[in-house]
Amino acid sequence: MGLTVACLRIVVLVSTLALGAPSQAQSPPSTQASDPRAMGWMQGFPPPADKTIRFTDPDYFSFPKLRWTVCHFRELMPTAGVDRGPGAASALPQAPEPGIDALRFTPLGGQASMSWGEAFDANHTDGLLVLHHGRVVYERYAGCLGPHTLHGAMSLTKSITGLLGEVLVAEGALDENARVGTLIPQLQDSAFGDASVRQVLDMTTTLQFSEDYADPNAEVWQHAQAGSTLPPPAGYTGPRSYYESLQQIRKGGEHGQVFGYKTPNADALGWLLARTTGKPLNELLAERIWRRIGAEREAFYTVDAIGTPFAGGGFNVTLRDLARLGQLILQQGEWQGVQLLPSAAIERIQRGGERAPFARAGYAQLPGWSYRAMWWHSGDAHGAFSARGVHGQTLWIDPVADVVIARLASHPVAANAANDPTSLPAWRAVTKHLMAQDQTPLLGGQWVIEDVAGAGVIDRTRAFLRFLADGRLVGHATCNGLRGHHTSGARGRLRLRLTGITRKRCAPALMHQEERLLALLPRVTRYRIDDSGALWLYTAAGKTLTARR
């Protein structure tokens, strides 16, 4: 399958299409043959000369060396840690689902089916973990990766940067309508000077910046050398940091008209986050998320010569911790009963962006998709959205199925278009399977309330319920958040117990709706899910509540 220019843009700065990666006319070594251990990379004291990998090698990030490098960035370049704090790692309950490797699906554009296990190998997967209702139903490793190994996340990093950006917007610390040049005077004369924060977040800026890795004169090479992700050539006199590189990028047209996937947007956003909070990106992520979700290991960012974290592609993480991050987002920023991130930030990401600017960008394999806050939204019936990085890095979140899929990989080709045909249908196949096998249909996603005791609901009031696997009930009662517990049994029996609610006043009509809802919930005795997927809650007196995911 040929790569279009649009597809080539879906790459991280350390891509290798111009550095000796195999052409698509060639058949790269299989995942087994290219395993770092089978190849003998960096084995021995010292390793043989022809098995040594150095940062100064022009092909250190080319396949098949790539398969070793993705787990060893910390040995090759400067980094900054994302502190996990002193606490214990949070539990990931195990509930293995047999038969997932045998699931079959048809790749995009194909005719013959393939199995999930075959796709694992075809995509040169290093690790893949699936959470359903917060429980691990599938976990498998290969290549350089193990349960405690850190792996480069590539452009998946951008989505973490975007998440933190949306958090600051939701909290009022960062004005999404402000001009970047006003917030960062050093960027006033650059392409970003008159761009809004929102345009940077959604990558609807127009930059004179090429990420065509087949072009040796593309601006991406200088940006990579400025950020120290590639060794500069002899006599290099260009920018020496991300900050310097961003100031040299010029405007290519009117902002806000078309989606244009350009890594400098993420680096500009990283600068905005640091300027707003007074903290570098690695410290901000540690403070807001990493120390609070029970991460197993310190994560890290690669950094430039002055210590600036690479906001567009430098994050390194374990597979399990990546899955924990996905579960936090699936749970609307709530973790073990504590709201770590404003739910409004997650909801804005989950809604996706405008489809028209995305459609004009030419992603033929992603019809109906959109992009918001550096997250990719599928536009499908489940509202699935994802963080994506080249060589196969993925964090796929399906709110309806209550599924998180985390994958770290070292695919030979540095473009998502190369693995999407065997990845996107695989994600949908496993979510369909898990939903079909689900013995706890109440769990998963938000049940958005459509009617309370026959009185309907006021439009756009965001009343919803979430039934969590540990027995907790969380939701929004119209004006206020609620929490409690749920217990279900045979023949649709259900008991709900409320244990807390916030006490914010709002308009009388909204308060009246909330009062009706809060009066009904403790009286619920049973439930059913009808053929349309609607949830019905019943009281002994015959009153009902209906909701839909």
Language-model features and meaning:
Residues 118-129, 142-173, 177-191, 195, ...:
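Short active-site loop at a secondary-structure junction
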Residues 22-145, 202, 206, 247, ...:
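N-terminal leader/targeting segments and the immediately adjacent pre-domain N-terminus
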Residues 439-549:
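Lipid interaction determinants
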